[in-house]
Swiss-Prot record:
Transmembrane regions: 65-84, 91-113, 118-140, 153-175, 211-233, 249-271, 286-305, 312-334
Entry keyword annotation includes Transmembrane: yes
Cellular localisation: Cell membrane
InterPro entries referenced in this protein's UniProt entry, alphabetically: UPF0324_pro
Organism: Streptococcus pneumoniae (strain ATCC BAA-255 / R6)
Entry keyword Transmembrane helix: yes
Record-given protein name: UPF0324 membrane protein spr0034
Membrane topology listed for this record: Multi-pass membrane protein
A Pfam family matched in the record: Cons_hypoth698
Annotated keywords: Cell membrane, Membrane, Transmembrane, Transmembrane helix
Family: Belongs to the UPF0324 family.
Length: 336
């Protein structure tokens, strides 16, 4: 059986949902195309779940396309530029990532939340939302319903942050520089960071958007050490005392992601325009939307809602902790 005859129907279903979601995401950037894709997929699940000819293509899209998307994501990271501009925000970023991951670990231990779901919520809250979840899910072998649940939790607090942060920043008397650092650190998805910073700029005729985006990109770099650590930890759990294979410890798609980041950094240092990589970054985003479509189509919405209480609570605790840690660290380093 050829690849297309086996996977074509499922991939086509994901493609159609993704095109619609991409269009809707352009109109409602606070929500974003990946969230539209996952929810449209879940709404269609009751009607399409009986069509078994879709299964192979959905599995390919939710796993392989997601890995390809993560590799292409590397072409959006110029490591030297991010470090040069974003280094002043590193103490805040490292503090918030650490506190969120510690909370996620303790929560799953004391409240019996599934470890993989807690991990996804933790990395999604602390690093960069859907992109971090997309990179982490294949590494820890998370199930589709766990990915869908984590994305849904992150989405809720993303929208909430984009709506209330400009008002909160005004109430706290944040400077323009302070709000850029606050939004770039305490909001976990690029679209929501953009929405919050743009709203602030509209209120105060400032230019915080670029700074907030660079802080966000600096956070994105944490995907590399976090996924490598989780991959090693997962391999240790599976292999126990058996010898570990390099491919199992460090999945190839993560290594390719790192190589893509290094290649981008090298080429831009040699004079290649960053716009050269724009098509690859856009393709990465679209493949993530396709993967989310597949995950949505494989997820029972009713069952997910019934089991979401603990994950929403974890998301809320992580979100509040990140806000408080960000503001506390900003006060300490004098960027308020």
């Amino acid at each position: 059986m050829s690849f297309l005859s086996k996977n074509g129907a499922g991939i086509l279903a994901c493609l159609l949902i993704s095109i619609l979601s991409w269009y809707l995401g352009g109109f409602f950037p606070v929500i974003g195309a990946p969230v539209f894709a996952i929810f449209i997929g879940m709404l269609l699940h009751p009607f399409l779940s009986s069509y078994k000819q879709l299964d192979a293509g959905l599995t390919f899209s939710s796993k392989k396309l997601l890995q390809y998307a993560v590799v292409l994501l590397g072409f959006g990271l110029n490591i030297s530029q991010v470090f040069a501009v974003g280094q002043s925000s590193l103490p805040v970023i490292l503090s918030t990532i650490s506190i969120a991951l510690i909370i996620a670990y303790l929560f799953q231990r004391f409240f019996a939340l599934d470890t993989k779901l807690a991990t996804l919520v933790g990395v999604g809250s602390s690093i960069c939302g859907g992109s971090a979840i997309a990179a982490t899910a294949p590494v820890i072998h998370a199930k589709e319903k766990e990915v869908a649940q984590a994305i849904s939790v992150i989405f809720f607090f993303n929208v909430l942050a984009a709506l209330i942060f400009p008002t909160l920043g005004t109430w706290l008397h944040l400077s323009n520089e302070g709000f850029a650092l606050f939004a770039g650190t305490a909001v976990n998805d690029t679209s929501s960071v953009t929405a919050a910073a743009s709203a602030w700029d509209s209120l105060y005729q400032s230019n915080t958007l670029e700074s907030a985006t660079i802080v966000k990109l600096t956070r994105t770099l944490a995907i590399i050490p976090i996924t490598l650590f989780l991959s090693y930890w997962q391999s240790r759990q599976q292999e126990n005392k058996q010898s570990l294979q390099l491919k199992k410890v460090f999945p190839l798609f993560i290594l390719y992601f790192i190589l893509a980041s290094l290649l981008t950094t090298l080429l831009t240092s040699l004079g290649v325009s960053s716009s050269f990589f724009t098509p690859l970054k856009q393709l990465s985003k679209f493949l993530i939307v396709m993967a989310m479509s597949a995950i949505g189509l494989k997820t029972n919405l009713v069952a997910m809602v019934k089991s979401s209480g603990k994950s929403i609570l974890l998301g809320a605790i992580c979100w509040i902790a990140i806000i408080l840690t960000t503001l506390g660290m900003q006060t300490l380093i004098g960027i308020f």
